């Protein structure tokens, strides 16, 4: 396996968007029909492409794991606000003991994961095999976060179309469906 850079405008290169269950198309199939690539586009040595690809995957996984955490901490979709909106609140607390407990547990894990990522960065910050573990945990954490928001939203958590649902509910449904792609990108969770 060798690693080549290929200009997407090269004759014979074409793409076809892959529509996900969220309705979005962030991924594409790429087709190479009789494409010729100059030798100068070889990255590294001939037959050493897998080593380069593994390093790229480590960086991608590191990005995804941090992105999953950042999505939870700085998101417009605050899990507590959504739960209060749909379940109600009493004395400033979510008005449902089960969800209050689940969300509290989730937020504690989110905080611990954030501290772990920070510590790993402080200790060197290099992409390594640790990035695979962080990517796996970050992916599962992000999926769980969205599952909690959807569940707490009740029927509004599966909003798609219609005037009876607001745009925030519709966007939450699509974001929840989008999290399924997190377990594939950057190397599958399997």
Short names for language-model regions:
Residues 3-114, 182:
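Glycine-rich beta->alpha junctions and the first turn(s) of the following alpha-helix
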């Amino acid at each position: 396996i060798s690693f080549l850079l290929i200009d997407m405008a090269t004759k014979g290169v074409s793409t076809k968007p892959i529509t996900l269950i969220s309705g979005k198309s962030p991924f594409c199939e790429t087709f190479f029909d009789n494409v010729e690539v100059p030798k100068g586009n070889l990255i590294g040595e001939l037959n050493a492409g897998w080593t380069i690809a593994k390093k790229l995957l480590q960086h991608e996984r590191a990005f995804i794991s941090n992105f999953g955490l950042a999505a939870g901490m700085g998101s417009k979709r605050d899990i507590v606000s959504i739960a209060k909106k749909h379940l109600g609140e009493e004395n400033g607390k979510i008005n449902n003991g089960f969800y209050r407990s689940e969300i509290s547990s989730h937020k504690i894990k989110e905080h611990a994961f954030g501290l772990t990522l920070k510590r790993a960065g402080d200790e060197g910050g290099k992409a390594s095999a640790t990035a695979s573990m962080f990517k796996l945990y970050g992916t599962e954490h992000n999926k769980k976060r969205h599952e909690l928001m959807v569940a707490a939203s009740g029927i509004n958590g599966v909003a798609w179309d219609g005037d009876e649902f607001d745009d925030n509910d519709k966007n939450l449904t699509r974001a929840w469906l989008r999290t399924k792609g997190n377990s594939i990108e950057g190397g599958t969770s399997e």
